[in-house]
């Protein structure tokens, strides 16, 4: 990742947050975004803040241990973000939303906790690899950190049951794009549920792994 100034990162958080909000991907004051800083620590959106109306100057700045340094009070989901950063060395940004189709997917009884979505499209695999399902925890529960730490090393995207998706990326743009792909794939799954759709075959998945470097839990880090 090319080094970016803190000012630019603050602007990017607000820009992507507004885009996600305006497209209905996270309603009200739901959802949060964080980005690691080159000099240490990270930025995160404040508690009770709408992603559509963020102020770059009011974003919360935290140290490497997730303790507030400046800005407004941070989101209650700091333990979740900290757990991902502590476990997944490649993560430089995290997006957590309450997007409708991903939340709906997380509530279905048939979902495989190790692969919440089947291999439906090439781009889902290329952007997300695979998605794990985390059992329900109340928002802000510190216990979610332990559950996340057990998965973040293998998965770049997880679904919090009855809550919403969490996606990590090596840039904020990558995390946002992967989040969008996850939400669209969840929508496809719900549209096709019960219709016996044709998924990618094991051979087609293996080809994506070979040609595009797609990484899945059984092949390495996703």
Name each model feature, range by range.
Residues 1-222:
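Glycine-rich flexible loops
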């Amino acid at each position: 990742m090319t080094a970016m100034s803190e000012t630019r990162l603050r602007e990017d958080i607000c820009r992507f947050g507004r885009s996600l909000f305006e497209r209905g991907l996270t309603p009200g004051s739901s959802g949060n975004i964080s980005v690691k800083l080159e000099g240490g620590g990270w930025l995160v959106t404040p508690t009770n803040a709408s992603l559509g109306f963020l102020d770059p100057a009011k974003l919360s700045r935290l140290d490497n241990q997730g303790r507030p340094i400046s800005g407004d009070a941070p989101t209650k989901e700091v333990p979740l973000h900290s757990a991902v950063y502590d476990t997944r060395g490649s993560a430089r940004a995290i997006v957590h939303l309450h997007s409708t189709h991903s939340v709906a997917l997380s509530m279905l009884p048939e979902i495989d906790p190790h692969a919440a979505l089947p291999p439906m499209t090439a781009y889902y695999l290329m952007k997300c690899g695979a998605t794990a399902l985390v059992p329900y925890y109340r928002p802000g529960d510190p216990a979610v950190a332990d559950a996340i730490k057990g998965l973040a090393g293998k998965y770049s995207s997880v679904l919090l049951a009855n809550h919403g998706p969490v996606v990590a990326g090596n840039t904020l743009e990558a995390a946002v794009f992967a989040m969008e792909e996850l939400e669209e794939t969840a929508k496809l799954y719900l549209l096709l549920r019960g219709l016996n759709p044709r998924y990618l075959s094991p051979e087609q998945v293996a080809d994506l792994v070979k040609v595009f470097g797609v990484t899945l839990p059984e092949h390495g880090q996703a």
